[in-house]
Amino acid sequence: SDVMMRETAGIQCCIDFKSEEDAMRKFKLANKLSPFMTAMFANSPIRGGVDTGYKTFRGLSWLNTDNDRCGFSGKISEEFSFEDYIDCVMKTPMIFIHRDNLNIELNGDITFEEFIKNGFHGESATLGDYELQANLYFPEVRLRNFIEIRNHDCVGGNLKYAILAIYKGIMYDNCAMDECEELFKHLQYKDFSELRYNVPKLALQANIKRAKAVDYAKEIIKIAEKSLRRNQTGDTLFLDEIKEYTEKGLSPADIIQKNWNGSWNKDLRKLIKYLNSKN
């Protein structure tokens, strides 16, 4: 969507893996974590000088972008593999191919799988075409030579380091990964998908089964913090601010909305000053 392309920015985190098994475990867990992380770090309620009523308008814009190439890959199935991910890319409608310094528009008329079989107006598929197709696939978590986690609003100060600290604490510690998998074991794909759709409006107050996102968020932070302490990384200090927000059931967006509709009197200069103070 134009809003997503022109008006939004986010923080991405990249995770290494050592084997297909390791990659798929981290990939599935990152997908399950993603709506909770989006809720925790929601920080984009203002658009065009107006309180949108959403905690993360960036998150909303992604819900209204091409659903063929966005969201979760492969319904987070337990059997998901490298081959399955490639199959998702292959079955995604194509946007364009690049030939002789020109873009040839395909406008979603064919999938990459169909392009390989049938070509397009005399053009045949190349490895470069596949690489472009993979780059134009925008799931919550993208698989490259690393795992690219893509679902966080821009935040400032220690909050941006908190995103990294949480993933470091969980993804590089088998015990922490075990605990997260246990935390999510009663949730199905539809639960994560419904939460993803509810988070832009409600952030941590969104419901998931018989709980709220905030209940899971608190546990996620605890698991990451225990891991960082156990491994003596010295990174737990980066969690202090997000812990404070989460304990109150708040995201950064809640503070912005309160001030915007209160003492800031909807003054963009005060919003900009506040955001600058966070960096």
Task: Report the location of each language-model feature.
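Mature, function-bearing regions of proteins
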Residues: S1, M5, I166, K243-Y245
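Amphipathic alpha-helical surface "interface" segments used
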Residues: G53-L60, K190, I242-A253
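Acidic, mature catalytic/reactive cores of soluble proteins
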Residues: L106-N118, N135-L136, L143, I147, ...
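Loop-rich catalytic cores of soluble enzymes, especially ATP-dependent carboxylate-amine ligases
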Residues: S1-R142
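An exposure/low-complexity boundary signal
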Residues: K75-I97, A211-L239
